[in-house]
Amino acid sequence: MELLENGVEANELQDSILKMESNEIEQSKVGIMRALVEAEDPSAKEVDNFMIRRFLRARDLDIEKASNLFLKYLRWRQTFVPNGSIGASEIPNELVHNKVFMQGLDKNGRPIVVIFGGRHKQNNIEELKRFVVYTLDKICSRMPGGQEKFMCIADLKGWGYSNSDIRGYLAALSILQIIFVENKSLRSTLLNDIDESQLPDAYAGQLPLVPIQDA
């Protein structure tokens, strides 16, 4: 038993050392990438290291590929969101349907987002894109320090052909992991990751739904 315990402790120590070394390598690459992108685009100075790291991880820590992708993102952002953010007055036809809600945090500290697909109506594609950016910015502003993910509950009840104009929406939200579950097990499935106090009341939880524009 003592040999087994010593073996387990040794493995845990080795894992900790490897994790520390990996973090040091990642942090070093974040610093290198920051210097490169700031030299190309001074506006990169306004972005925190978590954002830089996110792009690095998306390109398997390849600094060149991550830098190119990040600079492309900055150029897009400057063109599509010239004022730095999307205002509610720019997306009135999307907000009126109350289809996206911001809740509390799940058990892992991730913000909870609820999307009602059946409330989506075909509309101007450019306004839809602005709405997606508005939504993602709202979500990011609610993320605790160090958190990089959020949970999304995609409720497709009532969704049909008239709601199918969602290609741009789904593309922008492709980072989401969508899990389809049977209605009879929906609440228990959600409670695996969300405390009842944070679960939306629409799913027999205790927290009222909060429209994205009021979050």
Regions found by a protein language model. Name each.
Residues M1-A215:
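Basic, amphipathic alpha-helical/coil surface patches used to engage anionic, phosphate-bearing ligands
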